[in-house]
């Protein structure tokens, strides 16, 4: 399974990551959401390099031009609700993509542990399509793998899956690598953090409170 860490090269992406991490700047809810959207757009552009293309002849006012256009049928899926601004960034670039949504939540127990429950899925046919499974935070990876399995159960198995996250933990990346199809999955992370707390919060991470969800799921 391939991992692409987008901030391994210095680009304008660094500015958006810095702002969503900054505890003062991220209190501006509109900027926070817009930066998630921008990071989604940048990630979508990078993923587009890995898709299948076929030549298409288009007619211009002065003649004809041959352009390589995306051949894959794309489905953009996210876990509600924190993923919505990030999800929109992908739709801005893949504007003819289908949508899929998973509503999942963390159910805590008295001993401090938790299980992840899926309560709602909206998903069409995934067979022979490319699935972009996007979630701002990839912490333990358990909710994302659970979402993937639920989507496949309802819509069938996609021909390829791109997992995208704004911030990913090393533990989450490892979990996804071991529990999703290795030859048919690529992980894209804008940034990777090393530490994951006992409550499954990524450190230094960021806060998703400004898009109606507490700091982290799993």
Language-model features, listed with the residues they occupy:
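PRPP-associated nucleotide enzymes
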Residues: 1-213, 218
């Amino acid at each position: 399974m391939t991992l692409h860490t987008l901030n391994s090269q210095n680009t304008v992406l660094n500015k958006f990551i810095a702002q969503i991490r900054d505890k003062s700047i991220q209190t501006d809810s509109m900027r926070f959401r817009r930066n998630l959207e921008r990071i989604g757009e940048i990630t979508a552009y990078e993923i587009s390099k890995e898709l299948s293309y076929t030549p298409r002849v288009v007619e211009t006012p002065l003649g004809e031009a041959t352009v390589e256009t995306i051949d894959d049928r794309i489905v953009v899926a996210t876990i509600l609700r924190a993923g919505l601004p990030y999800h929109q960034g992908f739709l801005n670039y893949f504007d003819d993509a289908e949508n899929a949504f998973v509503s999942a939540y963390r159910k805590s127990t008295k001993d401090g542990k938790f299980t992840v429950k899926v309560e709602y899925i909206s998903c069409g046919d995934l067979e022979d399509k490319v699935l972009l499974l996007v979630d701002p935070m990839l912490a333990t990876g358990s909710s994302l793998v659970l979402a993937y399995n639920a989507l496949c159960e309802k819509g069938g198995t996609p021909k390829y899956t791109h997992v995208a996250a704004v911030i990913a933990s090393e533990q989450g990346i490892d979990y996804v690598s071991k529990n999703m199809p290795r030859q048919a999955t690529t992980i894209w992370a804008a940034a990777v953090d090393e530490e994951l707390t006992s409550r499954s919060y990524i450190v230094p991470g960021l806060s998703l409170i400004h898009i109606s969800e507490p700091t982290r799921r799993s």
